[in-house]
Structures are given as structure tokens and as C-alpha cells.
Amino acid sequence: MILSPECPVFRNDDGKLLLKPQMASFITSPAPNYGAAADNRSIELPLIPKVLHDRSELVLSLAMAHGYSQIILGAWGCGVFRNDPNVVAMAFASHLLGRWSGRFRRILFSVLDSSTSKETFTAFQRALRRAA
């Protein structure tokens, strides 16, 4: 994981330049690549849910250790890495409904889902609804 504290953000969601840069801290943590494992090392596929569970806890722990009360999380590898949205959502939900329940003031999930089925979005909505 990489913590990049107090980085200036120069543009808004539409790509327009902000009048004044906003400061934000970023935690970079790679998602396991289910697709690569399936194609090249299928013996490792059963390890992925535990890796997701453990890494998601590390991300939350690092955020809390640095006093971040508001966090934005993503659909960790549910696109090109082909991670199962239900597994990823449950990895985060297990912590946010358990040990980390009520520890953050605000948690947002940025979930890009342009499919007609909205399977990825629905998986996160279903898993995290109880954490709201």
C-alpha cells in the first residue's frame, strides 16, 4: 500500500479547473487480479476472497490510523480484473458492519457500472445497505 497524504486536486468531476485546489489524501492498494489468476494460476483462485478481505481491512486500518474520517472506496478490480462484485462488496461490508462500524463519519463507494444489469452496483448496494 502507498499513502499519499495532502495531494492537491485541481479539477472537479467534470474535468473543469477548480478556482482553488482541494487537498486530499490517497491510499493506493492493488486489488488481486482474478482474471490473470484464472488465465495463468488457477490454483490461486481460492485465495482471492481472503486476500480481498485482508487488504480491505488494511486499507481501513491505514485510513483510521491517519485520522481520516471520510473515505471514498472503489469497486476494487470488478472491471478489467474480473473480481466478483459480490465478493469485493462483502469483503468491505464484513469490516464496515463489524469492527469498523461507526468508526468513519462518511464512507462513499465509487462504483462504475455501465452495464444494463447494474450487477456491480447492485452487489455493493445490497452488501452495504445495512452499513448506512
Predicted regions and their residues:
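Macrodomain-like recognition of ADP-ribose-binding/processing modules
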Residues: 1-132
